[in-house]
Amino acid sequence: MDRTCEERPAEDGSDEEDPDSMEAPTRIRDTPEDIVLEAPASGLAFHPARDLLAAGDVDGDVFVFSYSCQEGETKELWSSGHHLKACRAVAFSEDGQKLITVSKDKAIHVLDVEQGQLERRVSKAHGAPINSLLLVDENVLATGDDTGGICLWDQRKEGPLMDMRQHEEYIADMALDPAKKLLLTASGDGCLGIFNIKRRRFELLSEPQSGDLTSVTLMKWGKKVACGSSEGTIYLFNWNGFGATSDRFALRAESIDCMVPVTESLLCTGSTDGVIRAVNILPNRVVGSVGQHTGEPVEELALSHCGRFLASSGHDQRLKFWDMAQLRAVVVDDYRRRKKKGGPLRALSSKTWSTDDFFAGLREEGEDSMAQEEKEETGDDSD
């Protein structure tokens, strides 16, 4: 594991000084510095073991950066311009040696992580622009396109293992169950799709929701499936109850464009209004704001291999890092308070939009409000 995800080392208590070394000490930040791109990034992924971040932008360029909390140490390692149109998604292989990218040009590329060299190109992998990518294991990956097509690929073979088109609109996002048997798809037609990739067959589509389904993830140890939507609502499905929603939760957001789980109960959402919200699932609550891309839509979110950093890309052409360490602990151990309806979102860090102490705000609430909330909570914990 790289040092950025480790605890900061204690300072050496020695009084000895090197007379030849008079340089100012390196500044250590809470998070790595922002990365500025020439175009918005629509694909974002962290390396599974090293402090590397990959991004693919709307011009078709792919970048890999090394990131660090030491000021001035976040750097571009290489870039690739092999895609002819926008790069829609990127993903590292399980061993971290390869980077897979998909594009509006309908191609799948496999790049070497160390040098950025193109090792394999699958041209015209789909008949329509590819919009989403998910790695199943070291050899198998799934792709979804703008017309609802789903393909399953084995990198050791030519051609797709599975090619299905059950959705009527674009595939926005995909997720996998822990057994790697069922592929879940969120589509612009408002339906959650279920595909059995072990038997290579279609299972079912859920009832259509009123807006596009833009994201999908498993929560609550696989017992719940959460889907974000273009109307700003999170739809919840019970596992093995995919036909209809079990619950829904409307955020005060124009839309939910991307979503990433932080714990089994907490996820972060990115919206058109530029705000990154931390949301607790069952009980359903907006915990507060992790950060924002001021006035610009959030395009993609990714969580680092150690879980400490959330990275976000926005239409402001910046990649930003947000510290998740304290938030993860509070949600799991301490967070029991209900946010007042109609009030502003609570800032979860000094980087959000204020320097207020979010945790002090929680501590100041009285015990009576906690008791009242616990009494009311039975109405929130729907199955």
Curated annotation (Swiss-Prot):
Phosphothreonine PTM positions: 378
GO BP annotation list: rRNA processing
Gene3D superfamilies listed in its UniProt record: YVTN repeat-like/Quinoprotein amine dehydrogenase (2.130.10.10)
Bias (Basic and acidic residues): 1-11
The keyword Cytoplasm is annotated on this UniProt entry: yes
Pfam short name (any one): WDR55
InterPro entries, per database record: WD40/YVTN_repeat-like_dom_sf (IPR015943), WD40_repeat_CS (IPR019775), WD40_repeat_dom_sf (IPR036322), WD40_rpt (IPR001680), WDR55 (IPR017422), WDR55_POC1 (IPR050505)
A GO CC term attached to the entry: nucleoplasm
Swiss-Prot/TrEMBL keywords: Cytoplasm, Nucleus, Phosphoprotein, Repeat, rRNA processing, WD repeat
Biased composition (Acidic residues): 12-21, 365-383
Major subcellular location class: nucleus
Record-annotated disulphide pairs: none
Annotated SUPFAM superfamilies: WD40 repeat-like
Region (Disordered): 1-33, 363-383
WD repeats: from-to residues: 36-75, 82-121, 125-163, 166-205, 208-247, 250-289, 293-332
Residues the record lists as Phosphoserine modifications: 14, 354, 382
Location of this chain's protein in the cell: Nucleus, Nucleolus; Cytoplasm
UniProt record similarity statement: Belongs to the WD repeat WDR55 family.
Annotated function: Nucleolar protein that acts as a modulator of rRNA synthesis. Plays a central role during organogenesis.
Stated name of the protein: WD repeat-containing protein 55
Organism: Homo sapiens (Human)
